[in-house]
Amino acid sequence: MSVVVTGATGHLGRLIVESLLRRGVPAGQIVALGRTVDRLADLADRGVVVRAADYTDPDSLRAAFTDAEKLMFVSGSEVGQRVPQHHNVIEAARQAGVGLVVYTSIAHADTSDLLLAAEHRATEEELRASGLPYVLLRNSWYLENYTGQLANYLAHGVAGSAGDGRVSAATRADYAEAAAVVLTTEGHAGQVYELGGEAFTMTELAAEVSRQSGHDVRYTDLPVPAYTEVLVSAGLPEPYAATLADADRGIAHGALYVPVEHLEKLLGRRPITLAEALRVAG
């Protein structure tokens, strides 16, 4: 079995490679792709095949997918450019005759009104039309989106536009492990997995930060424009801030809520919880 992993220089792609190795896939049967192979040197030292590839360069993708049996297609990071970039990946996979494409999408991509969902929906539609066997991993939010803000929460509290909505966030490591399970076991072709961890509200997030830190941390719910301004004032570019605020709007209406059972079944255990992730981050 040869498995090609795109985006291996990114957080999720790297974790997927590590999960494949832990599951016993020989290093020489894993191909890690990145724009800059220098950033994959440590994997090469461990026997992983590394190749340069760029979603904007179809020739590099075709060369990178040579002899690939399975393709772990990690969605691109350039919001607004994903549709043409993902087209290049799918077309290169089709030309290479890849046996299975596993794509990281977003929760409820086919029906979601999140700004982030449109490009994933278009990619899913193109995958279906391509004739390639595929699996859709519709990942919800990352727990790291919250644990990475711990210092800010302690200083300023938790702010957002999520209301009482619940978000099914899980760690990148758990999403990566689930992807590795799909890549190394049979019976997944054609499946759509809605993946997420145990759900929580922003009020529950603030309460858990309070419990673990001993500080009084509260959640302040804001209108979407006001929350966007908070994010911009914190240094985020306006388009990115607007996208994050829109995600909170979606959380308020259930856009990032999924039952935990799909992820739990793939992992063979319950996913890491918010409380556990905060404990590690603290």
Predicted regions and their residues:
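Oxidoreductase cofactor-interface core, primarily capturing Rossmann-like NAD(P)-dependent enzymes
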Residues: M1-G34, D38, T56-D59, T66, ...
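Conserved Rossmann-like nucleotide-binding pocket used by diverse enzymes
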Residues: V4, R51, L267
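Short loop/helix-cap segments at secondary-structure boundaries that form the rim of catalytic
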Residues: R39-R46, A63
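Rossmann-fold cofactor-recognition segment
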Residues: A44-D57
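Compositionally biased, low-complexity linear motifs
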Residues: F65-E69, G282
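Conserved beta-strand segments of the P-loop GTPase G domain that flank and frequently precede/overlap
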Residues: V74
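A hydrophobic C-terminal alpha-helical subdomain
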Residues: V224-G282
